[in-house]
């Protein structure tokens, strides 16, 4: 299920780095994390929904790439974001 406009705006306002920010890595990762969490709950109920499972794996890969990028440009922002989102670190 897609994010409602209000829910998306709430996430953007919570994670934006400046007033007109909509595309920073933090915002993109937060939006992906929300969608991943919703899709994970959907897949717990609908175990045979393989199309959604593939979409979930693509989103996880995209989020991972953004997290690697964020860690490369600013390890402090990366550490703060994974704490706020309560996700595991992807950098070893």
Swiss-Prot record:
Transmembrane segments: none annotated. The keyword Ribosomal protein applies. The keyword rRNA-binding applies. InterPro entries: Ribosomal_uS15, Ribosomal_uS15_bac-type, uS15_NS1_RNA-bd_sf. GO terms for cellular component: cytosolic small ribosomal subunit. It holds the Pfam family Ribosomal_S15. PROSITE patterns: RIBOSOMAL_S15. SMART domains: Ribosomal_S15. Keywords: Ribonucleoprotein, Ribosomal protein, RNA-binding, rRNA-binding. Coiled coil: none annotated. It comes from the Bacteria. NCBIfam families: S15_bact (TIGR00952). HAMAP family: Ribosomal_uS15_B. One of the primary rRNA binding proteins, it binds directly to 16S rRNA where it helps nucleate assembly of the platform of the 30S subunit by binding and bridging several RNA helices of the 16S rRNA. Belongs to the universal ribosomal protein uS15 family. Part of the 30S ribosomal subunit. Forms a bridge to the 50S subunit in the 70S ribosome, contacting the 23S rRNA. This is Small ribosomal subunit protein uS15. It comes from Symbiobacterium thermophilum (strain DSM 24528 / JCM 14929 / IAM 14863 / T). The gene is rpsO.
């Amino acid at each position: 299920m897609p994010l409602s406009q209000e829910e998306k705006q709430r996430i953007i306002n919570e994670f934006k780095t400046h007033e007109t920010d909509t595309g920073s890595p933090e915002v993109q990762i937060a939006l992906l994390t929300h969608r991943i969490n919703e899709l994970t709950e959907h897949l717990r109920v609908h175990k045979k929904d393989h199309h959604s499972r593939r979409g979930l794996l693509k989103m996880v890969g995209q989020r991972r790439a953004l997290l690697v990028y964020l860690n490369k440009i600013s390890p402090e922002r990366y550490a703060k974001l994974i704490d706020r989102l309560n996700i595991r670190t992807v950098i070893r």
